[in-house]
Amino acid sequence: MPTTVYTLLCQTDRTGQVLGVFADRVHAAEIAHSCATTHAEKLRRQDQQTFKAPVAAGIYQVHVEDLESNLTVFIRHRFLDEPESYRWLVHEFEIVPNQE
């Protein structure tokens, strides 16, 4: 009997890496959202250092696209409406045991 698992990938325009494999889709989605939220805060703090001025907490917004078995979490700059290069992807896979 096949087992369903969910992989969490962190992807940029140039690289990608597997962050984990989960038995529960909701848990994988929560981790993806948490990673994106943490990265958005890092970007906000970098902006504060660059501009030497306070930057509003909601300047980078976390968005979730739920496409049936796949989920994409990404960050957009609120005013520029541009997506940030990092994306967190949750993909569903079935593991089929070897029938020997």
Predicted regions and their residues:
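Short, flexible beta-strand-to-coil junctions
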Residues: 9-15, 23-24, 65-67, 79-80
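Short, mixed-charge low-complexity intrinsically disordered segments
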Residues: 37-100
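Short aromatic-glycine-(Arg/Gly/Cys) micro-motifs in beta-strand/loop hairpins
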Residues: 1-18, 27, 33-37, 45, ...
